[in-house]
Amino acid sequence: MSRKVFQRKEYSIYRAGDGFIIHNTNGEFVKHHTHIRSFKKAKSIVDLCIRKKLPDKPNIWEIESLMRLTRNNAYYNKLRDLLEGLGE
């Protein structure tokens, strides 16, 4: 069973096994959650989602995690464009 360890706005972070789960509580758990290994990175991802910012040093897994969490279409599209740019 997971235990909530942090919440900021609609984002909850749960301790799960050897990592953490971030869930956007405004969306279905199945569609709007992601798994992260460190608590520090989980909090960073929550902060990026709330401020709708792009990571300074983007990598594929981080962008995909942000895309799974957000329910904002404009932010999702910015993340998708960034992800496509990394694939070139």
Predicted features along the sequence, with ranges:
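Short N-terminal "domain-start" leader segments
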Residues: M1-I22, K31, R51, I60, ...
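Short, surface-exposed secondary-structure junctions/capping segments
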Residues: S44-D56
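N-terminal DNA-binding module of tyrosine recombinases/phage integrases
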Residues: D56-S65
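A short, exposed loop/beta-hairpin motif centered on an aromatic-Gly-Thr core
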Residues: T25-K41, C49
